[in-house]
C-alpha cells in the first residue's frame, strides 16, 4: 500500500490506477520467480508475508533516512503484503475483491484478514456471506478477526458489553 502511495499518491483501495499498478508490480515479481525457477531448476516462490516485526522496523529505518512522508512513513508500521491498510474504511466484500487477485500470484503463501467490529454469533448469515465471498473470489487463506473479552472474575470468554452475561459484573 505504501509503495503505491509513493508511486501514484493512492493505495489500491483508493483508486483503479493504484489497483492496476499494484497487480502489475506483484505480477512482475511472480514472473521473475517463475523464470528463476525454470532457469535454475530450483523452486522459487513469491510469499505475501505478514512479517509483523519487519513492518515496524522498516518504517523506522525509512523515516530516519527519508524523513516523514505523508501516507508512508507517518505511521508506526507498514501495511503487510498486499493488504488494504487497516485504517482505510472499506467494506469486507470490497476488501476481499481487491485482495483476492494477489492470492493467485503469491504461490509461496498468503492471507487476507477481515476485521469485524462485533460478535459474529449475532449475525451468522453475514459471517457466512463473508466466508462464501472469500471462496468465490479465490482467497486461498482467509481469516476473520473479531473482538473477544474475558471476565477476570468468572472466566467468561465472549463479547462483554456493559455487563458480563455470566456473573453480571459491571466493572
Stretches found by the model and what they are:
Residues 1-170:
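Long, C-terminal-biased catalytic regions of enzyme "large/alpha" subunits
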Amino acid at each position: 500500500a505504501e509503495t503505491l502511495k509513493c508511486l501514484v499518491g493512492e493505495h489500491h483501495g483508493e483508486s483503479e490506477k493504484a489497483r492496476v499498478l499494484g497487480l502489475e508490480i506483484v505480477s512482475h515479481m511472480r514472473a521473475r520467480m517463475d523464470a528463476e525457477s525454470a532457469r535454475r531448476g530450483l523452486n522459487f516462490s513469491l510469499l505475501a508475508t505478514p512479517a509483523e516485526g519487519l513492518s515496524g522496523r522498516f518504517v523506522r529505518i525509512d523515516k530516519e533516512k527519508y524523513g516523514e512522508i505523508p501516507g508512508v512513513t507517518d505511521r508506526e508500521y507498514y501495511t503487510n503484503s498486499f493488504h488494504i491498510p487497516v485504517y482505510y474504511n472499506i467494506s469486507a466484500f470490497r476488501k476481499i475483491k481487491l485482495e483476492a487477485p494477489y492470492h493467485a500470484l503469491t504461490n509461496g503463501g498468503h492471507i487476507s484478514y477481515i476485521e469485524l467490529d462485533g460478535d459474529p454469533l449475532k449475525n451468522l448469515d453475514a459471517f457466512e456471506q463473508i466466508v462464501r465471498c472469500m471462496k468465490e473470489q479465490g482467497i486461498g487463506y482467509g481469516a476473520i478477526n473479531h473482538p473477544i473479552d474475558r471476565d477476570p472474575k468468572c472466566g467468561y470468554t465472549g463479547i462483554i458489553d456493559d455487563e458480563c452475561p455470566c456473573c453480571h459484573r459491571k466493572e
